[in-house]
């Protein structure tokens, strides 16, 4: 998720890009004049608006196709056997001029690894919105999550672009965006199979998180949806799907305000919902404004919910109760994991920005975030004996550097873990000014027990996207395996997929070279070959060839 831009040279400071956000009522011309540059030397007008996510290295890719046997530098271990699914925010038609970077159409890029060979396939998720706009060859949907700005003919359509995450569950590849329910996609062909694959489970929610969590010990998927009963409602549903996709738990709670609840964390018994300091407002939407506005008066808030009806409750808790806890105004962006301490408290780790990391959703007064805002990685502590609405203590800063997209060895999800992998900015290798995707030019491997951190530097004018972790074997020790991440080579205008052995983290053991640039992913996941049934080739296979006998050394007939 592209959120932070133009980092400074200090390891402790993270600057935010502050684009001009015009007032909703201001008319916008049908075409935009792009600044003169090498790509547009004649300063030609375009229906594509000038925006940070639609220019430079974030130029829309809009590609569908496949590449067999990508060029590999180095050697890929045969144990890496499966598919890296990633989804990009890639608008197919020129979007509404005032729309935001997180609302482009979902485009999947899949990389299948087998016996050291990597095949690639790209295809759009054919959402209802994508098909309507592709048929019309123009934008029909207006602002993000604001149907009042959509063309009247499509207001009854699902406006999800399914562009945020891809998760395999119950043998279904789910394309997710939290504004709606999942789309199901074929894991081999990438064809879109349908909307709401769990409809038969009877959960009366309009939404499904882009960050469901897998409990590897119970083989369950923990799900939530906010604004579950409609726009700007306070209703939040939490539920659990078993390995066959059957609902086994369901609990409804209320959010303290209509907050942006993007991510969560799970422990053995608890679900922690992370509320960002944005607020939805129906009246603002009806006037043509954005769904979200940052509120500097709101605290970062964490809703703690029992995962099951059978969850042992602390003293003072009632059956069906949830509690929320507050800190200061900030944005805990993505979680790594959470666990239950021996002291009875809950602990959760996340990346954190000390201001609004989505400046395209400013407060109603239009204020932009502080350009010197810090970013770091923090550990939060929750004492469940405290009443709802209590303020929690300041979190422990685990890594005091700009960072994002933390991942763990997810075989240990719900338990206290040792290793964290995440994108970081390495200032010793550059000033960060030439990077535009958060300036995150490296990866970190941090040990929570020893506090040791190892770094992988991607190179000058490169930026790194969200990492994934692949265990060396199903029973290997925690953190023993490989980390994989897409690296954008900004000057060359193309991308590489790097493979790093965690036993020697500072260098890649293999680089998969893409012959072109593709859009930055929002999120992605690794699906091992053993986790799917009947996996086919991702790309077109050659039929059996019979030798013709007409080669240069063969006699004339």
UniProtKB/Swiss-Prot annotation:
It comes from the Eukaryota. Residues 1-46 are annotated as: Disordered. It is an enzyme of class 1 (oxidoreductase). Trans-resveratrol binds at residues 144, 177, 404. Binds 1 Fe(2+) ion per subunit. Keywords: Dioxygenase, Iron, Metal-binding, Oxidoreductase. Fe cation binds at residues 211, 262, 334, 523. InterPro entries: Carotenoid_Oase. Piceatannol binds at residues 144, 177, 404. PANTHER family: BETA-CAROTENE DIOXYGENASE, CAROTENOID 9,10(9',10')-CLEAVAGE DIOXYGENASE 1. This is Resveratrol cleavage oxygenase 1. It comes from Botryotinia fuckeliana (strain B05.10).
